[in-house]
């Protein structure tokens, strides 16, 4: 089995080394094509107005000056060429990708691009348990559970329009209570803020920021948020087709002619 790995934190991110370790447990044919720079929050953006620069860093290790989506396309269509991967792994992200994160996440987008290309794809993210731990997430949980979760899902097959989103809780491996299949949650949006500043010429500029102590989430039962709060590994199947079928049926009564 040939595995293609990417991420959104960049080619020098520690989580990329963790995804390589996980991939090495699954295959002896692992390739890495990752962004040269941090691409967190770029979602599924595709570089159409700038050229892509590809740099070979080492054996089966490449950096692309582009997004995670660019990396998966470049890896699949150029680096590997006619030796197509059998599996795409994106991560391990520094920080969870749950609830509305799935819309913004470059990590999930990398896996989604693999799904679009017809490849079984997984996004992996490690919760770090609060701002004070942002620079020291506990990667050991991802190391301990990542490969086994992927093997079990692959044993039943991944639907062609589905990406698997895996999130690891912020605890020691021995504190993990199990692995649960979840649905996408919804969080309190009170954590977002705008930080305003002035440059040396008095012109305003802004950063999108996050509250250090936001209003706590009340996770719904069966959600990815609830799983992580309970020290469970969360496995969420996400569909590429985002059509709201129930509302479509209502709209059909308004617009569709007999």
From Swiss-Prot:
Q: Where in the cell is it found?
A: Cytoplasm
Per the record, a Pfam family?
Answer: SurE
Its Gene Ontology cellular component terms are: cytoplasm
Q: Write out the entry's keywords from A to Z.
A: Cytoplasm, Hydrolase, Metal-binding, Nucleotide-binding
The UniProt entry, under InterPro entries, shows: SurE, SurE-like_Pase/nucleotidase, SurE-like_sf
- Judged by the first EC level, this protein's enzyme class is hydrolase
* Cofactor-binding details, from the entry: Binds 1 divalent metal cation per subunit.
Q: Where does this protein hold a divalent metal cation?
A: 8-9, 40, 93
**Which Gene3D superfamilies would you find in this protein's record?**
Survival protein SurE-like phosphatase/nucleotidase
HAMAP family, from UniProt? Answer: SurE
Q: Which PANTHER family match?
A: 5'-NUCLEOTIDASE SURE, 5'_3'-NUCLEOTIDASE SURE
Q: Which family does it belong to?
A: Belongs to the SurE nucleotidase family.
According to its UniProt entry, what is the function of this protein? Nucleotidase that shows phosphatase activity on nucleoside 5'-monophosphates.
| Name assigned to this protein | 5'-nucleotidase SurE
Instruction: Name the source organism.
Output: Afipia carboxidovorans (strain ATCC 49405 / DSM 1227 / KCTC 32145 / OM5) (Oligotropha carboxidovorans)
